[in-house]
Amino acid sequence: MKIYKLDAIVLKSRDMREADKILTVYSIQRGKQRIVAHGAAKPNSRKRGAVQPFCFSEFMLHRGREIDAISQAELKEGFAEIRYDLDRLTAAAYITELLDGFVAEGEPNQNLFSLLYSALHLIAVGNSEMILRGFEAKLLGFSGLQPDLTNCSVCGAEIRETKVSFAVQQGGILCKDCATHEKRILKFSRGTVEVLKTLYRWELTKLQQLKVSEPLKTELSALLRSYIEYYLEKKLKTTEFMDRLYKSNLGRGTNI
């Protein structure tokens, strides 16, 4: 098949030569894939509006020797609200970078595509902080990395303590005895663990209704970030900027 269709969300874009763009997209049909949009950087290009980051577009592609090329592009959903708000733009950049880091090319997953689409939609229309935490948690789950939050990850004992030890290497919480043998553990309140359980149970669309105190939000963000960075073996480029933006937002009552 020389020509085929993709229904895809653009994760990122970079310029190639004067007018071409290399896109990394995540599609329903093929998962993550790199494609080229010839001439898309030209002001009068018909492809221009459909190849921007975060856009959900329909692409017709023809096969190339090294990389497949877009022959036609139609924008299906641009999430325009994201582009005119720094908080939303940063949140969208974070989840697309996160997904790009976790998934390999050529592994389609309908649930993961739906998660990404829903997250972008919710970021475009409302406050995004719990949406980000929910996206992180559910992405870990789809990647087979959902932590054990009920029993000790080493011995299997039920955890009842109000302060909980979490070991990223073990992928879950630890009892007091097993925690003494781990060099790198994180301490969290029982409330943070219960909120994390809720992130896995509830649909992403419901999480904006979840009321969480600022201390629990801080702990939850730290827990998920530590776990994510351990498995990715790197810090994401967007997290440093997101942290600075979060601190500046505290003074005006908003956060991401």
Curated annotation (Swiss-Prot):
The UniProt entry, under NCBIfam families, shows: reco
Q: Which InterPro entries does the UniProt entry name for this protein?
A: ARFGAP/RecO, DNA_rep/recomb_RecO_N, NA-bd_OB-fold, RecO, RecO_C
Membrane-crossing residue ranges in chain numbering: none
Q: Name one GO biological process term.
A: DNA recombination
Record function comment: Involved in DNA repair and RecF pathway recombination.
Would the keyword DNA repair be found if you checked this record's keyword annotation?
yes
Its GO CC terms are: bacterial nucleoid
Which keywords has UniProt assigned to this entry? Answer: DNA damage, DNA recombination, DNA repair
Q: What is this protein called?
A: DNA repair protein RecO
**Is the keyword DNA damage assigned to this protein?**
yes
| Family membership noted in the UniProt record | Belongs to the RecO family.
Judging by the UniProt lineage, the source's domain of life is: Bacteria
Organism listed in the record: Desulforamulus reducens (strain ATCC BAA-1160 / DSM 100696 / MI-1)
